[in-house]
Curated annotation (Swiss-Prot):
Coiled coil location: 179-201
Superkingdom assignment: Bacteria
Family per similarity comment: Belongs to the THF1 family.
Name of protein: Protein Thf1
Protein source organism: Parasynechococcus marenigrum (strain WH8102)
């Protein structure tokens, strides 16, 4: 029987795969996903289905917006996955394929197609599946009201074998955290822009002083 990896093992493997400093704004999502993927890797009944793949892609992209340098997020996701036995390329391809399929269906056809993504009997639920369902609804619908989309996701979750109460709670938390993240990124970008303007002003003043 293979040795069971601990969270310390996963963290060690992660830092070896991603030996970069993570800014405080993004450290929380990195820590949360590392722990979540670690726990899921030990769930015998967990299946990394399409809903999970879309949810992981959505959560990661939502909470790493504004990340610098721009080439680091891909490496960060790869490290989070590989340190817990997941294949990030396979998951990204599954998510992209699923999102493209969702965009190509009419409303009725979408619901029929969506049932193909149902959770198998007895399979372990992950909050990322709820986010994946919401993302598929966003991709397939012209509906722009976030609350309406969440309510629809909760209703559809029953037919997909997902626990509706947990889906509702998980999507409410996801929505709230997304709003806070957007505000934090906006504030960070405004602060960086202000710092750049101050630096440019100092350089201009120094140049004028030298010229004079």
């Amino acid at each position: 029987m293979a040795e069971r990896h601990t969270i310390a093992d996963s963290k060690r493997a992660f830092h070896q795969a991603f030996p970069h400093v993570i800014a405080p704004l993004y450290r929380r999502i990195a820590d949360e996903l590392l722990v979540e993927l670690h726990l899921l890797s030990h769930q015998a009944t967990f299946q990394a289905n399409s809903l999970f793949a879309v949810g992981l892609k959505t959560v990661f992209e939502r909470f790493t917006q504004g990340y610098r340098p721009m080439e680091h997020p891909a490496a960060l996701l790869s490290a989070l996955c590989s340190s817990n036995g997941f294949d990030d390329e396979q998951l990204k391809q599954a998510a992209q394929h699923c999102l493209q399929d969702a965009e190509g269906h009419s409303d009725d056809a979408f619901q029929s197609w969506l049932k193909e993504q149902s959770l198998s009997d007895g399979a372990h639920y992950s909050r990322l599946m709820a986010v994946g369902l919401l993302a598929l609804l966003e991709a397939s619908s012209d509906e722009s009201d976030a609350s309406s989309l969440r309510q629809r996701a909760v209703k559809l979750s029953v037919d997909l074998g997902l626990p509706a109460e947990r889906v509702e709670k998980d999507l409410t938390v996801f929505s709230s955290n997304s709003e806070r993240m957007e505000q934090a990124v906006e504030l960070m970008q405004e602060t960086l822009a202000a710092d750049r303007r101050k630096k440019e002003k100092r350089l201009a003043e120094a140049a004028e002083s030298t010229a004079g």
